Design a protein with these regions (language model features):
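ATPase catalytic-site recognition across NTP-hydrolyzing enzymes
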Residues: 1-29, 34
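Residue-level detector of short, conserved catalytic/binding motifs and their immediate flanks
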Residues: 25, 36, 89, 187
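Short beta-strand scaffold segments in enzyme catalytic cores
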Residues: 36-42
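Solvent-exposed strand-loop boundary residues in beta-sheet-rich modules
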Residues: 44-46
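Mg2+-dependent endonuclease catalytic cores in nucleic-acid-processing enzymes, primarily RNase H-like
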Residues: 48-179
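Acidic, Mg2+-coordinating catalytic module of metal-dependent nucleases/exonucleases
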Residues: 176-197
Length: 197
């Protein structure tokens, strides 16, 4: 398994998470045409936790791309409700999201779009210049799971299922058919979160 240190009985909790004062939330994105995946992680004292998951496709919010829909759903649930304030957000994710494309406006990318929708600054972005190799990511993730008070809360139970399915072969994460829910987009977003902590 990719996450060989992960143990359901030790790392999954049925409890509801609570956001304490000064809790930082990490928003970890995996960008795909569809769906876009947002894993929400929390760091508080010695606890590193995954507290929520938002997955959106082109039908999630009318007139919005999957990425925009993820951002709007997060904004509604966490910012508009007052659960957290903008200064405590850190955005991370797939390093390819900093690249432009043929349909992109100059100096715009996935991260500038996220920052614009959430009303946060570039200084709250924590992105590697390029994604690290899967084999190194595996060691970082398992070291964190083993050595920290790592939890996955019930509100993010799908994260646990995806992590349990993740396999590595010849130094690469084995990905299945995205249409059958085996694209491991959630696992990728989890890796980006753990790699930046």
């Amino acid at each position: 398994p990719f996450f060989y240190a992960l143990r359901r009985e030790a790392h999954f909790t049925d409890e509801r998470y609570s956001l304490h004062d000064n809790t930082q939330l990490y928003l970890s994105f995996d960008f795909n045409k569809s769906p876009s995946t947002l894993v929400i992680g929390m760091i508080y004292q010695k606890e590193i936790a995954i507290i929520d998951l938002i997955i959106c496709d082109e039908n999630s919010v009318q007139g919005k791309s999957p990425l925009e829909a993820c951002c709007f759903k997060f904004k509604e649930k966490y910012l508009s409700s007052g659960l957290i304030t903008r200064p405590y957000l850190i955005v991370t994710g797939d390093a390819s999201g900093t690249a432009g494309g043929s349909d992109k406006v100059k100096n715009e990318n996935f991260y500038t779009k996220i920052e614009s929708i959430l009303g946060i600054g570039k200084s709250q972005r924590k992105i590697r210049k390029k994604n690290i190799e899967h084999i190194l990511s595996q060691e970082i993730c398992n070291s964190l799971i083993y050595n920290c008070n790592f939890k996955i809360y019930k509100s993010a139970e799908l994260v646990l299922f995806d992590m349990e399915q993740a396999q590595i072969e010849n130094g690469k994460l084995v990905k299945g058919d995205r249409d059958k829910g085996k694209g491991l987009d959630i696992t990728d977003a989890v890796r980006y979160f753990m790699d930046c902590v």
